[in-house]
Amino acid sequence: MTADKEKKRSSSERRKEKSRDAARCRRSKETEVFYELAHELPLPHSVSSHLDKASIMRLAISFLRTHKLLSSVCSENESEAEADQQMDNLYLKALEGFIAVVTQDGDMIFLSENISKFMGLTQVELTGHSIFDFTHPCDHEEIRENLSLKNGSGFGKKSKDMSTERDFFMRMKCTVTNRGRTVNLKSATWKVLHCTGQVKVYNNCPPHNSLCGYKEPLLSCLIIMCEPIQHPSHMDIPLDSKTFLSRHSMDMKFTYCDDRITELIGYHPEELLGRSAYEFYHALDSENMTKSHQNLCTKGQVVSGQYRMLAKHGGYVWLETQGTVIYNPRNLQPQCIMCVNYVLSEIEKNDVVFSMDQTESLFKPHLMAMNSIFDSSGKGAVSEKSNFLFTKLKEEPEELAQLAPTPGDAIISLDFGNQNFEESSAYGKAILPPSQPWATELRSHSTQSEAGSLPAFTVPQAAAPGSTTPSATSSSSSCSTPNSPEDYYTSLDNDLKIEVIEKLFAMDTEAKDQCSTQTDFNELDLETLAPYIPMDGEDFQLSPICPEERLLAENPQSTPQHCFSAMTNIFQPLAPVAPHSPFLLDKFQQQLESKKTEPEHRPMSSIFFDAGSKASLPPCCGQASTPLSSMGGRSNTQWPPDPPLHFGPTKWAVGDQRTEFLGAAPLGPPVSPPHVSTFKTRSAKGFGARGPDVLSPAMVALSNKLKLKRQLEYEEQAFQDLSGGDPPGGSTSHLMWKRMKNLRGGSCPLMPDKPLSANVPNDKFTQNPMRGLGHPLRHLPLPQPPSAISPGENSKSRFPPQCYATQYQDYSLSSAHKVSGMASRLLGPSFESYLLPELTRYDCEVNVPVLGSSTLLQGGDLLRALDQAT
């Protein structure tokens, strides 16, 4: 029994030994086969001898697939193959990247040996592995799109459907540091690779070896060259003369540019700062550059293809740009974009204009020649060269269109000295009947000889110290300024004169004297003043802060200057107008000659409220033409002129009693100072349907005074009924009794000589309408001899702007109690001897009658309405 057991045990052990020996033999044979297979790989012996079986299998399969690809694509000519073998080492040295062959499934079947130089990973470590194991997960979808072969037209972009070429960017793991050291794969960083190549299609086996007559599907692989993008801070090789650096914001606006761009493309670095790089790309390359910009923002680095950048003086150059996003080391946020620009060619098609920036060089030589016209300082030379300039621009209309202003630019009027090119007005004169020339027309004829001798481009002259006319309306300026709104229209169809309006906006609007500057300041203050409502029943308004009050207090004998107003800006004359226009004077002289007797005195109501009167009350002051820009962008309300007031001819027939104020002087036709200009009288009916109902501030003030008079007369009658006609007691009642007495006797106290408001005419006749109508006007200025009149002035504008500049005295209060200025009016008593309420700008804006003066609340009615509302 024991012998049998030993035999069985020995047999099993023998079988085990045999199996172990067989396995050992198989492993040795397998190792021998793998060893032989490893030696068959195109690898050095030092590398292949240390490979494990899995690596040998992976590399062998990759080699076989690569060999099949090469055999189906490349030629079998050995001579060419030998030449390629000799050039292999030179290729790798010349390339700035490595070669990779990736199958449709993503397996990297071939990688060049120099991959370790750029990525740190060796060829053996990566060959046979999937590309998705070493690339960024966000790039996998893009990699799959580039690996697949699209046959249908409904897939992807048209460019990929029609071509097998590929150009994309991917991020791959890199184990080499900036200093050249190699780290572990777990510590690897992402490096952007620019992959360019094409898709190759090949068969898996020859057609005659196909199984059962079925053809195997076509195999495709992607052959690409991967070029890593070098970081700008790690460039060791200095840039050549055909390369320049630039820094941009994240939206590709220039923040820095190298000086080399000037000699390469023509731009100066200062011209590019703040401008987008898209402004200088060729239109056909803008789509590719937009895609490159998107890749740059998503992946951090990009290399643009060859694109065209427009040169400054026409044409373009071919460029290639490497862009890198610089991140903030603190918060890892993108900070800017650094670009290395390689100029690949010279300027091509430099005679072709591709953008508006390149048009400057075409006109610059001509413009420089034109600028030389104005180098000479002589008047004759300027006149001749200005004619040459007009002829030059007329011959070249394209150049004239280039010099035309764009919307928003200032309009600068060009005056060529002699007006030989103006449109003739014979057409309008042939239709309209001849009329008597106005004063402005006579003046234009008298100054025509002087205008011909002026230079082509004149500088506005400063006005005289006593003149309130801006320099744009002086006689020394070559620009003719309209004096009335009718001058802005032609005589045929009342169309606006374009050339006159252009001159209006082109003239110098700066104030030349101190009065106009201070007046603008006062108008600014008026905007912030609140209306003053007294509590004692007397509705007197505050007067604006005018600098003339201080001047009048110091020099009572001097003629007060007029405050300018913002109510008359463009549609009012630019200078103070003579109170008695020649048209008005001629009219009254004709009436006096026809009657030969002194007419009867009309009642006050008929004088001031005659709606059908054609004579207008001469305004005391005008307004300088000031555009909105000089007022700080504030809107300036344009007001129509006051309705005409009719004065009786008797006010003008008493010229023999004027020697009392100024002394004796020879009689003659009255004249106006040189700064006074006349204008054609406008009718108040030309401003809408309001017509005669529109009252001027002076007329409103007069009506208020008449109401006050009636109220005081009623109170006086009440006092007489109570006290039997004796003056009532008390200071307030005593003053009221004095006022009623003065009103009854016709010798009411007048206001001190100061301007009531910037918008109310400072006319003593309107301030004292209750004066006896039979009293002569004794304070009219004497006429000047004809020799004192300047030849350029109008012979018909005679009267000075202030015919009633009389220094009246207030007899109701002593000089110590006379108040002046804003502070004194606030602190002083409200029963001051002002019988004419002062109107401010707010009164004129709020109390403008709309349908008639009868619908407005005034005085006590207004106070009662306000009390009921509150």
From Swiss-Prot:
UniProt keyword annotations, A-Z: Activator, Angiogenesis, Congenital erythrocytosis, Developmental protein, Differentiation, Disease variant, DNA-binding, Host-virus interaction, Hydroxylation, Nucleus, Phosphoprotein, Repeat, Transcription, Transcription regulation, Ubl conjugation
Predominant place of localization: nucleus
Annotated segments matching region DNA-binding: 26-53
Annotated ranges, domain PAC: 304-347
Key word DNA damage present: no
Tissue: Expressed in most tissues, with highest levels in placenta, lung and heart. Selectively expressed in endothelial cells.
One GO location term (cellular component): nuclear speck
Disease tied to this protein: Erythrocytosis, familial, 4: An autosomal dominant disorder characterized by elevated serum hemoglobin and hematocrit, and normal platelet and leukocyte counts.
The name this protein goes by in its record: Endothelial PAS domain-containing protein 1
Originating organism: Homo sapiens (Human)
Gene (UniProt): EPAS1
